[in-house]
């Protein structure tokens, strides 16, 4: 049974101690999708390993998330929504939205919690999409 999200507090210090490892799926060695999976696991939802996500096109990622992994696209992010970054129609990064910021990990800076605008200011030609997990927000209408 899923934990009550209103009672759950993100332990940011725990994640900020993790280090970026390509393909990392176990704390403290996480890549960006590994971090998303670990956060969801801590709130009671199991996400797929999705090893090859870096090779996904926007269409494939959206189709996979919506159909297979019980996500749906949203335009106004809420806490625990997944934020996905695409460049030239290719998925290259994901993170977790929390309190209008992003929790994410990258190869050159490990894990951090910062305004989304900080990440976008260093990148050109990026498309951002937000996805909500139906397992966590089952009480809302889609």
Over which residues does each language-model region extend?
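Loop/turn positions that initiate beta-strands
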Residues: 79-82
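N-terminal capping segments
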Residues: 1-72, 86, 92, 134-141
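Aromatic- and glycine-rich peptidoglycan recognition patches
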Residues: 71-72, 91-142
């Amino acid at each position: 049974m899923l934990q009550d999200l209103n009672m759950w507090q993100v332990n940011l210090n725990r994640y900020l101690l993790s280090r970026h490892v390509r393909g990392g799926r176990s704390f403290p060695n996480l890549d960006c999708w590994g971090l998303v999976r670990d956060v969801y696991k801590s709130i009671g939802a199991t996400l797929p390993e999705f090893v090859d996500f870096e090779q996904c096109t926007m269409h494939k990622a959206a189709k996979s998330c919506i159909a297979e992994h019980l996500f749906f696209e949203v335009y106004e992010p809420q806490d625990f929504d997944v934020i996905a970054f695409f460049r030239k129609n290719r998925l290259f990064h994901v993170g977790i939205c929390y309190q209008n910021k992003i929790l994410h990990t990258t190869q050159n800076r490990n894990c951090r919690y910062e305004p989304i605008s900080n990440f976008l200011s260093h990148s050109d030609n990026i498309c951002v999409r937000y996805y909500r997990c139906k397992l966590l927000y089952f009480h809302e209408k889609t």
